[in-house]
């Protein structure tokens, strides 16, 4: 698989490419399936339909890897929290974790068992996916998942979570430890079910100052990486801590690929990290609105990463109103230009 070869810093005939959120609302085929089942969570839990939308971008766009269709918040949902997705507001937890009693109600064992629909999605997808296409499993980072569990929803300031960090760090560490232990088993089950690699998304890493990031986020990400590598050394691990360009010189750990967001210059990230890790990224997602903007960025990024281990991706997820034709153009352009 060209994607796995790139993860492991092997030479590839061209630069493999995929997009975060590639199984999503910009695709009419995805919306048709989602509307058939009734909604986002219903689609996550319907393994046959979830498998179908996982494969769609491979068939429609020609990306080099499929990423499991699911959500990072199925973890707290299946631990016992009450999750709703509300249009215009996003995910909402009716009863956020506020104290030890709330935490005691959540079950690691229950979550790992209840997530069978994810494992079934993986098994079916791996069976149907072309043999040369990688299947990416994933989870949210403990810190990012914790922000939703504690805040009850998305936040601009994360003040509830950060208040806990500075006033009761021991309790926050307890929450993060429970999430981390659950994620270890969750990713292990994804690997057993057939994923070829896993990505850990830390979407809200940028909410933390440097010292707090390494204590309350990175430490737990690396604990998960160490667990996976000890048992499955052949499985590449991708980490994506968004918005931490100022901390790159302090990054360490037992992973293979470092995801670079669009706000981080790829050239500076490469100088610090390319000797040890494959870099993934990092075109600005809004460039997909215009083919000239796509072409300019693709050429610049390929030039920057020439001769260095690289997986092409966006610097964050594709947006719902991107024209499918532009997404196809992007994938094709990367594959063609990088093969010259």
Swiss-Prot record:
Chain positions recorded as substrate binding sites: 21-25, 71, 148, 203, 316
Pfam families, alphabetized: URO-D (PF01208)
CDD domains attached to this UniProt entry: URO-D
GO CC annotation terms, alphabetical: cytosol
Entry's EC annotation: 4.1.1.37
The keyword Lyase is assigned to this record: yes
Site positions (Transition state stabilizer): 71
Localization, UniProt: Cytoplasm
One GO molecular-function entry: uroporphyrinogen decarboxylase activity
Assembly description: Homodimer.
Family: Belongs to the uroporphyrinogen decarboxylase family.
Role summary: Catalyzes the decarboxylation of four acetate groups of uroporphyrinogen-III to yield coproporphyrinogen-III.
Protein name: Uroporphyrinogen decarboxylase
Organism: Campylobacter hominis (strain ATCC BAA-381 / DSM 21671 / CCUG 45161 / LMG 19568 / NCTC 13146 / CH001A)
Lineage start: Bacteria, Pseudomonadati, Campylobacterota, Epsilonproteobacteria, Campylobacterales
Designated gene of the protein: hemE
């Amino acid at each position: 698989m060209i994607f796995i070869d790139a993860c492991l810093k092997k030479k590839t005939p061209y630069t493999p490419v995929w997009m975060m959120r590639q199984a999503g609302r910009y695709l009419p085929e995805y919306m048709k399936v989602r509307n058939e089942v009734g909604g986002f969570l219903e689609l996550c839990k319907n393994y046959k339909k979830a498998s179908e939308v996982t494969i769609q971008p491979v068939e429609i766009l020609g990306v080099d890897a499929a990423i499991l269709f699911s959500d990072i918040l199925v973890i707290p949902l299946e631990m016992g929290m009450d999750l709703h997705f509300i249009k215009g507001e996003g995910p909402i937890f009716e009863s956020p974790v506020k104290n030890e009693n709330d935490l005691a109600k959540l079950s690691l064992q229950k979550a790992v068992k209840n997530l069978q629909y994810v494992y079934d999605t993986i098994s079916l997808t791996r069976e149907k996916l072309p043999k040369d296409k990688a299947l990416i499993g994933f989870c949210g980072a403990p810190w990012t998942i914790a922000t939703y569990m504690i805040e009850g929803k998305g936040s601009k300031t994360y003040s509830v979570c950060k208040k806990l960090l500075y006033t009761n760090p021991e309790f926050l560490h307890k929450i993060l430890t429970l999430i981390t232990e659950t994620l270890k088993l969750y990713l292990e089950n994804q690997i057993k079910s057939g994923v070829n690699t896993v990505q850990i998304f830390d979407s809200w890493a940028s909410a933390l100052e440097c010292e707090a990031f390494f204590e309350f986020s990175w430490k737990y990400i690396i604990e998960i990486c160490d667990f996976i590598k000890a048992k499955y050394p052949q499985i590449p691990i991708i980490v994506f801590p968004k918005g931490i360009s100022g901390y790159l010189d302090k990054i360490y750990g037992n992973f293979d690929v470092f995801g670079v967001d669009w706000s981080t210059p790829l050239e500076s990230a490469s100088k610090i990290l390319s000797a040890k890790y494959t870099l993934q990224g990092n075109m600005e997602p809004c460039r997909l609105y215009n083919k000239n903007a796509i072409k300019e960025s693709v050429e610049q990024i390929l030039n920057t990463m020439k001769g260095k281990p690289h997986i092409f991706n966006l610097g964050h997820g594709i947006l719902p109103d991107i024209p499918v034709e532009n997404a196809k153009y992007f994938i094709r352009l990367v594959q063609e230009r990088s093969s010259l």
